[in-house]
């Protein structure tokens, strides 16, 4: 037996197999290498593009060396190159309003669930539903952040709670003020278990306490929670319509009061700064407030007259001066010191001893001979326009006649000149040939 040739054959077969499998392995390695090369090129191009976008080269002026559009540049700086500006990143602003960990008080009474505060009309239910459920955290820096958040939310809640309490009082007729949690409608709830840093949140001043009382005839007054005995000038005025039974509350805090007698202000009841209810207990039944109007109350109406701003300086024609002699009392009931309400006079009539105030029609410009004050006349009825039309027509007719006569004269002169030019030609032609021939032959 000769085993040599079979072994050589097997070796050659193995060599052929490796030779055939080597290109396949290379083909499998080429696509990952190409992908890595393309990824490196793309990363380099992206880095170069980001560097050019973030740090452009200042070629012409000092106002073009940033990557912001023109609308945002107006808010940041003027572009004169005299100063620097700091741009806050979006991550910092997002971290302010959406913190990673929930803000909570070190004790549970600082932020109660919505079911415990349900009997009191407070706007904190929506605020608590937006944030996740708080967990008790005992770190001291979080205590100060909680107090600031509660103060801001309580100040924002003063304007919303007064409107909800007035609508509930007018529809159901039940009083909305409670004795113990009286400060819950306008300030943040504070409990005795809370630390003193959070207990001072209740000392928030409000000026819209008028909306909590559902009185049909309330006096124009405001009261502060911390100092209820000190009267203040009226900022909220109740205007009563003669036909509608429900009163309308009109806020005229920005208007200036007229020269009227000072109304008697009603003092709000003393409100406890800190509630004494333990945790887990509901508020007691509300106590009814006295709703009888005092006989010395004064229901005043404040009238605002329009003021026309003039940019050209003070001129007597376009200024509307305010006078306090005659307020417009149409559709308004004014009760002075308990007297019976008098019917309002009809429009256009004035009481005795009162002179009419300045109106919009009294400020008209004095009528004169100017063309701006006579828009109702036609153009041809004015003397200036009529004279101008007549003179223009005469001048135009004369100019047209002059042109016509000039053309006629030129035509006649041209005709006469043609006849004079043709006559010597005929004479010369008839004269030259026979004379020369006769003279030559002669």
From Swiss-Prot:
The chain crosses the membrane at residues 388-408. Residues 48-58, 433-442 have a biased composition (Basic and acidic residues). GO terms for molecular function: identical protein binding. Residues 1-25, 47-80, 152-199, 253-293, 305-327, 419-442 are annotated as: Disordered. O-glycosylated within the Thr/Ser-rich region which could interact with lectin domains on other molecules. It is a single-pass type I membrane protein. It comes from the Eukaryota. Residues 409-442 are cytoplasmic. The modification Phosphotyrosine is found at residues 409, 419, 431, 441. The record marks 383-384 as: Cleavage of ectodomain. It is found in: Cell membrane. Keywords: Cell membrane, Glycoprotein, Heparan sulfate, Membrane, Phosphoprotein, Proteoglycan, Signal, Transmembrane, Transmembrane helix. Residues 45-387 are extracellular. Residues 157-199, 276-287 have a biased composition (Low complexity). It holds the Pfam family Syndecan. InterPro entries: Neurexin-like (IPR003585), Syndecan (IPR001050), Syndecan/Neurexin_dom (IPR027789), Syndecan_CS (IPR030479). SMART domains: 4.1m. GO terms for cellular component: Golgi lumen; membrane; microspike; plasma membrane. PANTHER family: SYNDECAN, SYNDECAN-3. This is Syndecan-3. It comes from Mus musculus. The gene is Sdc3.
């Amino acid at each position: 037996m000769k085993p040599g040739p079979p072994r050589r054959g097997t070796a050659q077969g193995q060599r052929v197999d490796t030779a055939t499998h080597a290109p396949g392995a290379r083909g499998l390695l080429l696509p990952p290498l190409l992908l890595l090369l393309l990824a490196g090129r793309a990363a380099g191009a992206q880095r170069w593009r980001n560097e050019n976008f973030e740090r452009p080269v200042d070629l012409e002026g000092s106002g073009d060396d940033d990557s912001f559009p023109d609308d945002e540049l107006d808010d940041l700086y003027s572009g004169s190159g005299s100063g620097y500006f700091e741009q806050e990143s979006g991550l910092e602003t997002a971290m302010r309003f959406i913190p990673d960990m929930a803000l909570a008080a070190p004790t549970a009474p600082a932020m109660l669930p919505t079911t415990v505060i349900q009997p009191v009309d407070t706007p904190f239910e929506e605020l608590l539903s937006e944030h996740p459920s708080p967990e008790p955290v005992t770190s001291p820096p979080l205590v100060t952040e909680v107090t600031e958040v509660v103060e801001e939310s309580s100040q924002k809640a003063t304007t919303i709670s007064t409107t909800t309490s007035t609508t509930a009082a007018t529809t159901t007729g039940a009083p909305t003020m409670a004795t113990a949690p009286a400060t819950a409608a306008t300030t943040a709830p504070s409990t005795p278990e809370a630390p003193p840093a959070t207990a001072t949140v209740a000392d928030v001043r409000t000026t819209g306490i008028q909306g909590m009382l559902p009185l049909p005839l309330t006096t124009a007054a405001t009261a502060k929670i911390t100092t209820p005995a000190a009267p203040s000038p009226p900022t909220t005025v109740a205007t009563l319509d003669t036909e509608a039974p429900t009163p309308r509350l009109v806020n005229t805090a920005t208007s200036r009061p007229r020269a009227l007698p000072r109304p008697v202000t009603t003092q709000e009841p003393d409100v406890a700064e800190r509630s004494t209810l333990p945790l887990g207990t509901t508020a007691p039944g509300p106590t009814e407030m006295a709703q009888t109007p005092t006989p010395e109350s004064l229901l005043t109406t404040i009238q605002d007259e329009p003021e026309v701003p003039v940019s050209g300086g003070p001129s007597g024609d376009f200024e509307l001066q305010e006078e306090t002699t005659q307020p417009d009392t149409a559709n308004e009931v004014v009760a002075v010191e308990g007297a019976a309400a008098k019917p309002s006079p009809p429009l256009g009539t004035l009481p005795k001893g009162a002179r009419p105030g300045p109106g919009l029609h009294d400020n008209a410009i004095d009528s004169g001979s100017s063309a701006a004050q006579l828009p109702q006349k036609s153009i041809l009825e004015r003397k200036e326009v009529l004279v101008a039309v007549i003179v223009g027509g005469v001048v135009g007719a004369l100019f047209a006649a002059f042109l016509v006569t000039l053309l006629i004269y030129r035509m006649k002169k041209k005709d006469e000149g043609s006849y004079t030019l043709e006559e010597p030609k005929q004479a010369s032609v008839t004269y030259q040939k026979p004379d020369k021939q006769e003279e030559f032959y002669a």
